[in-house]
Amino acid sequence: MSEFTRREFLKTGIAVGTLTVSGGVPLMAARQTATDLVTLGRSGVKVTRLAFGTGSFSGKVQRDLGQEGFTRLVRHAYDRGIRFFETAESYGEMHKMLGVALKGIPRDSYKLMSKVTTREGVSPQEKFDELRTLANTDYFDIMLLHWQHTGTWPDDTRRWQEGILEAEGKQAVVSHGASVHGLPALRRVPGNEWLKLAMIRVNHTGKSMDAEDYNTQQPGNVSEVVEHVKKVRKEGMGVISMKLVGEGTFGREDRQKAMRFAFRNAGVDCVTVGYKTTAEIDEAIENLNMALA
């Protein structure tokens, strides 16, 4: 193809999926990317496919960067198009550090998720208010019940479930779900009408994934996890993948394989990854873009 005709070809929009036939039907869909906004099922919350996690080894990796280094990392992620940031009560100072890092960025330009520890003897509303203050935000887009690791969690956390619904009524929380660990807990996700979304451990090797013992050091049951992911997505739940890179133990090739597996095999909506360098952010974006190609 001559250079002239190549330019004319590109102008038609075929390369970006904009050429249409009669009736305006696209001949080719636009390419999907890591920073596209996707809806997390019936939660209705729109997030980027790639999230910014702050819980590497319970947040130690991110805390060790110090506020200045962590802020640079968050701003790099934002500049690269990541618009979904998540943390948890159990990650130490990460609510406060994330609030500082995001200060000055329009609140309606990104989504913020927190995860609450479902303790007895704690007021849910007081805890949500505390976390909002620490994160310097009026509301969380998503609040998860964190670290649900028993088969009885839907009954055990009833008070916290009601507390989240109350917070939603006050517009302190937009939507909700749970993060689950271990097959007994995961098996209670399908058919759970309270859940709008679930955070589930997914990768291709089973590293740090769900087994009968939630705390096992052995590979998890990949096939059963994927079965549950597919089922809950059919039910309309959103699914966020965690432990995608085996808690930081995977090399580059396995990180790429894990990303492909999460989206192409398991069919998750979104993945969260914890970072310590800007290069890791850039690589995660590249890996996800390749997985979607």
PLM-predicted stretches and their roles:
Residues R42-G44, G99-R107, L131-T137, P190-E193, ...:
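Acidic (Asp/Glu)-rich catalytic clusters
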Residues T33-V38, H95-K96, P124-L131, L183-P184, ...:
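Alpha-helical scaffolding within the catalytic cores
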Residues S56-Q67, S114-V122, F250-G251:
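Active-site mouth loops of central-metabolism enzymes
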Residues W147-A293:
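Beta/alpha (TIM)-barrel catalytic core signal, keyed to glycine-rich beta->alpha loops juxtaposed to Asp/Glu
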Residues S2-S109, H204, F261, N265:
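N-terminal binding-site loop/beta-alpha segment at the start of enzyme catalytic domains
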Residues L40, F52, F85, L98, ...:
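Conserved, mostly hydrophobic/aromatic
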Residues A135-G151:
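Active-site groove signature of glycoside hydrolases
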Residues D64-H76, G121-L134, G182-R187, D254-M259:
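Short, acidic/polar
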